[in-house]
């Protein structure tokens, strides 16, 4: 959006600023209008409103003017900031440069001032030696030209002279020393002529000399200009004595580069010896050379001497020491700066040339050493390989010789080893078979012990037959099953035998035929029976000593999977003394029993399950463990299609409780609460609604009838009550109710029952006596 005065801004920014401007202006107008309304009447207020609300065109013009002025002010601020930043950068750079070169500038200025003060002494000295110096102009001109070429293109000249000067001789060294001496003489003559001309001009020449000296101290590399001035002068010669002294001063000066810390002492000694000659002073370029290299006393030393590089810290330390030395020796060392600069430059160029030659020789030496070391390594590797091959050949030869000499003995030794291995395997197999036989013998011994116990048990198991076959109305096969069973002699007192068997075996007959294992028979009398436990006790008398009393075990210690033996007389006397083997398949089984054969279960019998073969006639037989002790009495078998070896035995501990009462009382007194019950599972929906049974109740019994003045009536039990829990145990049906009640036949204590009456849950105590 172009708003005039060369200001262009985005359209969105223009609109946003315009909205802000109008909003602020309207707010000010409203504020002014509100204040005017408080001070003037309604008519005046309306006129004021018309004056305050200006034309929209005026608003846009005011906005553009305001925005343009704002942008101009912003541009001015930006330009001022940039100018300030550039100025600050320049100030910082100048301050840095000023600080960086402050030390050198101070020393150079001090040298120039000191040189001006001693111009008179210098002029006198140079006048005395001017004639001798002019005679050597031609020689100095040639050598100075050669030095300029070497300094301008030192890399090229250095590479060309490296091959020629790689091994300098003594004659070459002397030649270089003479050239250096002649160059120093030319430098001194050049400076003498210049100072002589300047001294003739008086005060004007002194100012000119100070400027020349300061320029030379600030710009050391300007050797070409001084050479041109020397070329315009006449040649001079110096005595041989002055050449030697100047060479000694030059050597003393080079010592200062090598020994650093002893520089001041060497210079002071040199000045004392040459007090009537020109003292030496190092310029800035000499400082650079001293910072980068360390040289010997002799500048023309052997070119193989390596140059060592200094670190930044060492260079800074040398600079500081050099500046301090210059300040200390300004009064004595500022005479002939031009001469010293030229002589030092020529010395430095020669030294650099020698160093470049030295570096080239070192490089060639390194290459030669590298090739030599590579060849040596290759030779070593080849020699090692040859030695390895020779060693392998020697080993193979040794093995061949050894085999040719001792092969019969080795064959015999291998045969002996193989024979030993075969015999060891045979003996191990024999020992293994012996161990297996021992194990089998041990098993056979155990089996023999078990069978011995079984044979003893057979002497305690008898056949029990009643006499119902003559007058029984049952079918013959059914009658024979009921008439024949087995019994166990659990106690013997003299000739009196006490035999336990099943109640369904003795039936209703009082007298029973008892047949022993030796086929002798006696008549026994039934002392008592209990249909709820399906047990009966028969008493018989026999003087046969072969009949033995069975050992009683403990049924509370039975273990699932424990081996057992079943001894009985299946199918009568013809198969008496049959022994079958099995294990205990289950514990604490509740087996429903139908005693009266009306297809309705009468009682839950507590028993353990066995898988030994049980057949008709085994009822009342003995279940013994491997020790031959009685642990149970065979009571029932499940006879269903596709069901095999599922038989049940009454635990011997329960048997002992029952037979004790049967011996003395002939019966078992069970508590009778005087109720008749129905199972909840057999109720229909109408009967469930009649007793108001909750839907969550699935198992239990419903009281159908309560005897007057019976234990149930006395306990508060009523018809229609639903019993779901008895003595803390869940009640499934009426068989479970009878089993729990009969389990308290010995203590006859009251038990707690949980019932539902009219749909409400409650607890009552049922009396058992």
From Swiss-Prot:
The keyword Chloroplast does not apply. GO terms for cellular component: plasma membrane. GO terms for biological process: proteolysis. InterPro entries: Chloro_Bact_Ser_Proteases, PDZ, PDZ_sf, Peptidase_S1_PA, Peptidase_S1_PA_chymotrypsin, Peptidase_S1C. It comes from the Bacteria. Residues 680-733 form the PDZ domain. Its main location: membrane. Keywords: Cell membrane, Hydrolase, Membrane, Protease, Serine protease, Transmembrane, Transmembrane helix. It is an enzyme of class 3 (hydrolase). One of its GO terms (molecular function) is serine-type endopeptidase activity. Residues 126-137, 247-262, 331-347, 365-390 have a biased composition (Polar residues). Belongs to the peptidase S1C family. This is Serine protease HtrA-like. It comes from Staphylococcus aureus (strain NCTC 8325 / PS 47).
